Amino acid sequence: LTCVTSKSIFGITTEDCPDGQNLCFKRRHYVVPKIYDITRGCVATCPIPENYDSIHCCKTEKCNN
């Protein structure tokens, strides 16, 4: 499985997930109004949202774009 790790105006950076990590995730952490810190990558299980986080998990190639 290939997941997106970062995204910018120059394109996306991806990683091949290691064995046992068969989900891609995208975490949006609320910082201030209209500003989010976004983290992407591979995980074995979908993380539980904390505080002001929004988490999306998926199982297809680059689905966390």
From Swiss-Prot:
Which molecular function GO terms apply here? toxin activity
What disulfide bonds does the UniProt entry report for this chain?
3-24, 17-42, 46-57, 58-63
Its domain of life reads Eukaryota
Gene Ontology CC: extracellular region
Quote the Pfam families the UniProt record gives.
Answer: Toxin_cobra-type
Q: Name the predominant localization.
A: secreted
Expression by tissue, per the entry, reads: Expressed by the venom gland.
Other remarks in the entry = Negative results: does not bind to muscarinic receptors CHRM5 and CHRM3.
Protein function = Highly potent on various alpha-adrenoceptors (ADRA) (subnanomolar affinity for ADRA1A). Order of potency is the following: ADRA1A (Ki=0.37 nM) > ADRA1B (Ki=10.47 nM) > ADRA1D (Ki=104.71 nM) > ADRA2C (Ki=165.96 nM). Were also found to reversibly bind to muscarinic acetylcholine receptors (CHRM), but the affinity is much weaker (CHRM1, Ki=1778.28 nM; CHRM4, Ki=4466.84 nM; CHRM2, Ki=17782.79 nM).
Mind telling me what this protein is named?
Adrenergic toxin rho-elapitoxin-Dp1b
Q: Provide the species name.
A: Dendroaspis polylepis polylepis
